[in-house]
Regions:
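Catalytic cores of DNA base-excision repair glycosylases
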Residues: 1-168
Length: 168
């Protein structure tokens, strides 16, 4: 039963969303990382309203790494959880400069070391930037996967849903 459902869902997405892409606007892996961090608990549409100014002010990790919390906060204060996100963005950029030669790392293990980057964000970066098979499980994927029976009731966390979907 599940295999048939997986095949039907896969067929539908192949036919209707062959090139599914993020709706976040970005022009580099670094800028996508900023946008995905900002998108937590916020709509992509809202994030896209603020990222052009952010990307112009912080074209490289070193620019953001040397910014003050207050400057970043002022630029993102209308996005959800600006205090945490401002701290995470500056810390993320500092770690990129210090530990990764100002490059966005390509592995899940490295990505989740960055402040503000959890599995979902890391999986988006893996998929979009590095074209790797990755499953970014947000609240919508979690809910719909349960609702249509793609996962079992024992999948009670986003990680469990991610692992189950990737396995099948």
């Amino acid at each position: 039963k599940n295999k048939t459902l997986y095949q039907a869902v896969t067929r539908w997405f192949s036919a209707n969303m062959e090139n599914a892409e993020t709706e976040l606007h970005y022009d580099s892996p670094f800028h996508l990382l900023i946008a995905v961090i900002l998108s937590a608990q916020c709509t992509d549409k809202r994030v896209n309203m603020y990222t052009p100014a952010i990307f112009e002010r912080f074209p490289q990790p070193s620019d953001l790494a040397s910014a003050s919390f207050e400057e970043v906060y002022q630029m993102i204060k209308s996005i959800s959880f600006p205090n945490n996100k401002a701290k995470h963005l500056v810390g993320m950029a500092q770690m990129l400069v210090k530990d990764f030669g100002s490059e966005v790392p390509g592995t899940l293990e490295e990505l989740v070391k960055l402040p503000g980057v959890g599995r979902k964000t890391a999986n988006v970066i893996q998929s979009v930037v590095f074209n790797k098979a990755a499953m970014a499980v947000d609240t919508h994927v979690f809910r719909v996967s349960h609702r249509i029976g793609l996962v079992t009731k024992s999948c009670t966390t986003p990680l469990a849903v991610e692992k189950y979907l990737m396995k099948h």
